[in-house]
Amino acid sequence: MLPITNSLTYIIPILIAVAFLTLTERKILGYMQLRKGPNITGPYGLLQPIADGLKLFIKEPIRPLNTSPTLLILSPILALTTAMLIWTPIPMPHALTNLNLGLLSILAISSMAVNSTLWAGWASNSKYALIGSLRAVAQTISYEVTLGIILLSILILTGGFTMQLLTTTQKHIWLLTTSWPLTMMWFISTLAETNRAPFDLTEGESELVSGFNVEYAGGPFALFFLAEYTNIISMNLLTCIMFINPGPTQHPELFLINLVTKTLLLSLTFLWIRASYPRFRYDQLMHLLWKQFLPLTMALCLLQASLLVSISGIPPLP
């Protein structure tokens, strides 16, 4: 009974946070476009995400005739499962599983999520969905390269792979202050990794064909939607832990308040960017990564590694 209770107390708060992030996004976009946003369902529109979720899950799932039924259903389930698994090593202030290679496991699980996008495009048996999924996979895999190198740079600085060590390292000074170019590139790469504006080429909502999920409706579409917003929150949580010190570990209640506040501010920045910037062209997206971010992150990674080696060679003061 206890493992089931633990799992529920771990999953339910994430799903509630995701539900209200969608409402926050619609409200922020509304006010930035000089309108109200959802304000009818419940007080101040607070019940809107619950109504939307119910509507999507009670709709009949439409399956085109030529699709691969097993893969079509498995893809959204895999997307949400991998999005949830990313949260297991994250300390809030205690992790669900205290892994020795916590940061690497997060990177590995997020890489697995690419399979769900590819499967969805393939199973739809539609050329538009397949082209959309290939484009999405190319974007996600490309930006994982810079995320991996930035992660390696941070590991070189902290000297370990655990999340707790990152918190201890930033006790006196944030890594944002010492590695701000890496932080900026990490933040922009997380935008691309989670398919958010101005990099939302994976699911161009304003386009005639939205992307890999063009054949999805109802419940399976809702699972993809939940996975996307879960990834947004988890990436911002990771950014907070890596660069802007989530808080004092000796005071668990302060740690949680600090972590949630900083993550919320980063998530609001994501929404603000969506309301402010137009979509990039695909060639600009790839040019930014392969010709600008990649050489710069590699140079900074080598600089940090060489600095540590050179400083360790300096004899101690008498």
UniProtKB/Swiss-Prot annotation:
Enzyme class of the recorded protein, top EC level: translocase
InterPro entries in alphabetical order: NADH_UbQ_OxRdtase_su1/FPO, NADH_UbQ_OxRdtase_su1_CS
Segments traversing the membrane: 1-21, 71-91, 101-121, 145-165, 172-192, 224-244, 253-273, 294-314
Catalytically driven reaction(s): a ubiquinone + NADH + 5 H(+)(in) = a ubiquinol + NAD(+) + 4 H(+)(out)
Membrane topology: Multi-pass membrane protein
One Pfam family from the record: NADHdh
Annotated EC: 7.1.1.2
Function: Core subunit of the mitochondrial membrane respiratory chain NADH dehydrogenase (Complex I) that is believed to belong to the minimal assembly required for catalysis. Complex I functions in the transfer of electrons from NADH to the respiratory chain. The immediate electron acceptor for the enzyme is believed to be ubiquinone.
Protein family membership: Belongs to the complex I subunit 1 family.
Protein name: NADH-ubiquinone oxidoreductase chain 1
Organism: Varanus rudicollis
Gene it is expressed from: MT-ND1
